Amino acid sequence: MFTTAFAQREQTQPGGLPLDLFAAIESLKKELNAVILAHYYQEPDIQDIADFIGDSLQLARAAAQTNADVIVFAGVHFMAETAKILNPEKLVLLPDLNAGCSLADSCPPKEFAAFKAAHPDHLVVSYINCSAEIKAMSDIICTSSNAVKIVQQIPKEQPIIFAPDRNLGRYVMEQTGRDLVLWQGSCLVHETFSEKKIVQLKVAHPQAEAIAHPECESSVLRHASFIGSTAALLQYCQTSPSQEFIVATEPGIIHQMQKLAPNKHFIPAPPINNCACNECPFMRLNTLEKLYWAMKNRTPEITMSEDIRLAALRPMQRMLEMSN
């Protein structure tokens, strides 16, 4: 069923890999009663073998609703942690434990605890792209899909800390008119996009629409016809009459865009420097080979203390309730 060049190359590698990785993974899924959840930023082969592909909110909902005994999370560490928070009794596997997140890493728990203590009357709304420890210090979690909706439901007289992404925080401020206290974190991928090069692309492709993720800087967002989460970007490119799009987010999503709108053309937004990469180095640590070995060996497993899990669960549950 799956015959990509990547899979064919892996079949010839030494080290005990099966001849057909895709078939072996499908067999392990049945043996383990496992589900593979993958983010849109994963490499195409992983997206193609996943049981569910989505953005952070969709993946959180899928993790909360699954009947599988094993969750294999093809994403980054905080996403797999989220699955474990919602499913303490299940085995949650991450193909590569080094698949971290520059945004999550930009908000260390000790420093954030001090920041929170300096604003004792503030409600803490944290973007899901943060560690379990930060979630445990939060009142409500949000995603790029529902951040505006979440903040709009909070009484206007209630002051708010928004963490960790300053760019998403600024976008939420613009959309809601609320004055948020922002933690100054950011995503290395979404801050590499070049405003100048996007403008040049728009000149070279006058019929193209620029679409962007709200983690991008304001200088990039101002040139976008549409701003939204990865799921929203996918939906927009299917329904828009435009035939060409400049895409300002991690280019892994273009695989799904091309599958869902095969007659349209998608141009990845270029980075500031030619040597810079707009691919997430952490997302790309996961490979089909690592996915197989994680399932075969039932490791690396995501674990956390029960007190952190319970504290992180409460704001996650509030998000899911407020997003319905």
Swiss-Prot record:
Cofactor, free-text remark: Binds 1 [4Fe-4S] cluster per subunit.
Compartment annotation: Cytoplasm
Pfam families attached to this UniProt entry: NadA
Cofactor names: [4Fe-4S] cluster
UniProt binding sites for iminosuccinate: 39, 56, 127-129, 144, 213-215, 230
Pathway of action: Cofactor biosynthesis; NAD(+) biosynthesis; quinolinate from iminoaspartate: step 1/1
GO cellular component term of the entry, any: cytosol
Catalyzed reactions per annotation: iminosuccinate + dihydroxyacetone phosphate = quinolinate + phosphate + 2 H2O + H(+)
Top enzyme category: transferase
Gene3D superfamilies in alphabetical order: NadA-like
Membrane-spanning parts: none
Entry EC number(s): 2.5.1.72
GO molecular function, one term: 4 iron, 4 sulfur cluster binding
Keywords: 4Fe-4S, Cytoplasm, Iron, Iron-sulfur, Metal-binding, Pyridine nucleotide biosynthesis, Transferase
Disulphide bond pairs: none
GO BP of this protein: 'de novo' NAD biosynthetic process from L-aspartate
Residues reported in the UniProt entry to bind [4Fe-4S] cluster: 101, 187, 280
Family indicated by similarity: Belongs to the quinolinate synthase family. Type 2 subfamily.
Function of the protein: Catalyzes the condensation of iminoaspartate with dihydroxyacetone phosphate to form quinolinate.
Protein name: Quinolinate synthase
